[in-house]
Amino acid sequence: MKKSLLVLLALMLVLSLGACAKEEAKPVDQPAENAGETPAEVPAEPAEDPVELVFSINAVPGDAHYEAMMKFEEIVEEKSGGNIKVDTYHSGSLFKQDQETAAVKSGEADIIYSSAPWLVEGSPWLSMFNAGYMFKTYDHMTKALNGEVGEEVFERVAQEQGIRPLSAFYLGTRQINLVADKEVKTPADLNGVNLRMPNSDAWLFLGKALGANPTPIAFSELYMALQTGTVDGQDNPLPTVQSAKFYEVTKSITITNHLVDNVWPVINEAKWQSLSDNQKTIVVDALEEARQLCDDLNLQREAELIEFFKGEGLSVYEADLDAFSEEVLGKYLDNKELTETWDMDLFEKVQAIK
């Protein structure tokens, strides 16, 4: 009997301990972590809206700045993963050159090629950038306009006109091309030379400053004017002398470097501000690659053309650049009426760049 009682007590003890263990294993009622909430997540970056950029240019296939814009279009679409689409209308197929400034201001075009002379009406101080020897060389020009001075100039244009230049591409440097085989060392050597210039006050003043007798002739009539002796010469970048075949009716070229031609990709300011920071970076980076392509092509062509013209029988002379620069710029600075709109502080900044 005692034995049975002990067995029963032992069994009850085992069952009791098992129940206690089960109770301890049961979780205590606690509010669930973040009860009633979904787990916190890092907010996703908002998706960028797709962008279309309508680019109107008057450059034609074969021009370095045409090739540059095809490169720009390719890079932008690739780097944006197709988020930015560039529609380039070349050869003036969308807007003619004299229509483009109004088109980009109104937003009918998003980007155009422009330059200081085309934007003078809205920013008169820009006239100084088309003065003879404002820039001495390609390096001088690109250091200025693609550096801190350019940032200041482009921001100011954006504030004044609602359009923003983004870079400065090299088009070529204008040289003197004469019908006669004549060596030109200083402006005095151009005395009495009827030099064709575009028909505007600014261009005609440049012709006088160079020491010549400026004669306005339309570009379309220039070949015949050189051939018949209506004018004694003309000035243009070397690639233009080749493409227009002026070398067929002239006998000498003098390297004067009197005007470093450049062109600016200009975007509508409202369009620019509508882009995200990432999209702006893509556009700026693509333009820099396009600029390098354009500049390299034009520099290479100019170097090759010297030998080409010599092979065609033209004499190529080197002018005294210091003599030309000092006299030509001096004539601008002496003409207070011409320079009254210039920003002289900005002018001095440009001249100080080496």
Question: What is each PLM-predicted segment?
Answer:
Residues 154:
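Conserved glycine-rich "GG(E/T)P / GGGxP" loop and the immediately following alpha-helix
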Residues 3-4, 23, 27, 35:
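N-terminal cationic leader/targeting segments used for protein routing and processing
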Residues 1-9:
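Positively charged n-region of N-terminal signal peptides that target proteins for export
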Residues 16-19:
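C-terminal motif of bacterial Sec signal peptides marking the signal peptidase cleavage site
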Residues 143:
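Short beta-strand-centered segments that line the small-molecule binding cleft or hinge
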